[in-house]
């Protein structure tokens, strides 16, 4: 390679602003995917997690938390110095790649403003990584890399691509996430060998009819753009396995989506969807369907034909009922989220509809009763969230929920907990905050696996002595009650790491509590009388 590479002129444009990790993955928790907030399963490129949620981002796993960058950052040198140093490194890498005839070139995170045109000499390359740079354009010479299979361009400031890229007949993966594209570059539609296309977090408003030319696509991610509709031609992508259109402005889906029968993951969360086509029932391979945060008022009956569905998230829509028998037909469903809708009662369908459910989230609805026997066949139900409903009592068979591990009944109108709570022997987390409880049953002492017990904002006047049997308890929240004394046995809870006693009527503590003062952070304030 010519030594003229060292004389490449430095670009003097300002460094573009790169969105923070919080901005890129703001949603969710939940959240996931779909309830853990959308987890976009993108492959990792060297040194970078190519993922969402978390989804989401979240990507965020519906569901489904995200990591924090704790990297120590050294002071930046003067801008001019950085550019010269960056170019020198690039030249060194290009020369090394040519001399070693390497098929892989990683130029990520080099603060590159302009890729040297001499890159065209590296025709042996099959992988080129340019993510996390400061590129505003690509030189046409990249089109000379006719053996490229992978081209990673995420986290730059690209607004277009050169037409010469249509020479890349072998390209299978193109990553354009986190750029400044206002449209899908026309050359992308001519890359007919593509199997994976990432366009997440751009400014794209339209998907053209030419998308049909990318018939080999198995993964298409166009989440976090400004797309208002998908063309009917999307139905010609018959090899699609994952379609991620979350965080856009879709109001409807084309009926032709039903032709994409290989899809297993369909993420439509955070759009403006008003309805779903009946043809969605043709997606016989569908295992994950994310519809949280839309404007749906009904679910088509045809969804019952999606018998492979494992996860269904309908959080934050306007749904008040489900088609009768829908859940019973989804024989592989393990995770169901119906939170933040308009349900006034449990879905019609009887006990069989929950026989495979592991996690059920009905939070923030208007449900006033859990029907007797509704979980009689729910042998694997481990997580139930009924927070923020209108429950005044619990069903008589409450004590038969023996597989329950996490139970959230917060923010209801419960006045008592049945004595047969003692039957919930697998319970590890019990949330009863914001209710009207005046006392706890003695059977609470049988929950030997309990790690967290939250009783904040009730009307408790005392605690049963049996609470001393909860030896695994790590968190006990009793804040905002009417307690005047504590049982002496509380001193036996040596695994506690958090004890909340604030806003009660306590005038003294039992001597035994001194045994645990050295083992945990003591969060307490007194209201003396």
UniProtKB/Swiss-Prot annotation:
BP GO terms, sorted: cyclic-GMP-AMP transmembrane import across plasma membrane; intracellular signal transduction; positive regulation of Ras protein signal transduction
Major place of residence: cytoplasm
Family: Belongs to the SHOC2 family.
Protein's recorded name: Leucine-rich repeat protein SHOC-2
PANTHER family: NON-SPECIFIC SERINE_THREONINE PROTEIN KINASE, PTHR48051
Pfam families registered for this protein in UniProt: LRR_14, LRR_8
Annotated spans, Disordered: 1-87
Protein's cellular compartments: Cytoplasm; Nucleus
Tree of life domain: Eukaryota
Ranges occupied by LRR repeats: 99-122, 123-145, 146-168, 169-191, 193-214, 215-237, 239-260, 262-283, 284-306, 307-329, 331-353, 354-377, 379-400, 401-424, 425-447, 448-471, 473-493, 494-516
Gene3D superfamilies in the cross-refs: Ribonuclease Inhibitor (3.80.10.10)
PROSITE patterns: LRR
GO molecular function: protein phosphatase binding; volume-sensitive anion channel activity
Keyword Iron: no
Keyword Endoplasmic reticulum in record: no
Bias (Basic and acidic residues): 1-29, 36-57
A GO-annotated cellular component: nucleus
Matching SMART domains: LRR_BAC, LRR_SD22, LRR_TYP
Coiled-coil features, chain-numbered ranges: none
